[in-house]
Amino acid sequence: MPIAASEWSLSDEASFEDEMPKLWGDWGCSSEIGRLRAVLLRRPGPEIEALPEDLSSVLFVERIDPVRARAQHDAMAELYRENGVQVHYIEQMQEHEPNGMFVRDLVAMTPEGAIVARPGTLVRRGEARYAAEALARLGVPIVHTVCGSGTFEGADLMWANRDLALVGISRRTNAEGNRQVRAELERMGVGEIVTIQVPWSEAHFDGLMTILDRKLAMVYSSQAPYTAVEALRRHGFKILEVTSEREVRYGMALNVVALEPGRVIMPLGENTETAKMMEDAGVEVLRVDLRELNKGAGSIHCMTAFLKRDEL
């Protein structure tokens, strides 16, 4: 017997974001510093054991020791757990994809769910499939997969807060990928979305700047894009300027992850001046040794996809 239209259960005015905790799970991110609740990682598997002779062909700078690399990755994951962060994993990666551990590039989180990347380098192009499989297994909604001629990597999206998002154009994220990401953020009602032209020398802009606290950012002064710094200042951020190329390049001084406002994890290495600058500004700095993993040209921020942060 047909059901009368008057008896249909019609949609209410609730937004997807409002319904997500009940129907999908407690996911979402709209800042770099809100209390971190859940992350997605890839513990390096067989893919790091048979690196080619030409390391540059897989974007690595040095050959890594698999046993030491996994031990350091496990220590990073345990530090997250000790600080109340749920750690989830990508369970599979093809054996020719050693960069799969740099999960930040594969997933960009939004208040409504994940944007799945399309890496800009051919050697990384297949990794996103396994990130998408992990998201589906966890119940994280995928709001968009970058497609067509677009390329985009998650490290080219930085949330200052819900009212300001920075989206790069770089060697890894092209104009079409930037457009697709901007369109999703505009649909979600983000107050201001600023396109950042990333210097040619950089893969992404997350190695040039980071958010440390509600109104505190740190930048590598000689390379930080003007439009990014200007946007942050316009929104009331104080800017700390790092000048040491050695600390930024080799110590990965800006490759940090905030656990909450004013409290960050920083890779151990040649970055003591930058760490002191953070501490002098009132930021608590935790250290973790990732020097073996850093030989793959990335560190903790590159290896961490945020799945859930508290709203500021």
What positions do the PLM features span?
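The feature marks the mature, well-folded catalytic cores of soluble enzymes
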Residues: 1-312
